[in-house]
Amino acid sequence: LSKAERVTGKNVTLPILSCILLSVTDSILTIKSTNLDLGLEIKIPVKMTESGSVAVSGTVLNTFISNLTHDKNVTLETIEGNLKVSTKHSYALIKAFPVDDFPTIPKITDQKPFTFNSQDLIKGLKSVMYSASPSTIRPVLSSVLMYPENDSVVFVATDSFRLGERKVNVKK
């Protein structure tokens, strides 16, 4: 929960971005959070009685759960559109948000993953970051494109005036 809560957005115009989506199906609890720039999905095996989904404030849920020191088992259930979190010694009723309002986190395509040294990542990013736009009005211009090419990873950034490209050899 603490990892998911760190990804939640602090956008007051879109309160759903401050939420964590909890979904249970087939004895798997899926925890999702996003700030629209970054999405996180964590799957945990659980004991369940029925499937369902609920979106609640990430900060409120994480604060409550992190303060449970003596209880190992936590029960989650929805009651009248809210989330009841209970243990042997305590419980909380947390206001829920409409699940349909939670943004869809894009699925990763079947592209082949590439692995390389973190120092190469830092070197590549530092080489092209000056070309990325500091404004978030057009996100594509404030981003860095990374893609594999033969034994290299190519880093590309532009703000529409400058273009930076760096090829970092990653073959070991």
Predicted features by range, described:
Residues 1-172:
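Structural preference for solvent-exposed beta-strand-turn elements
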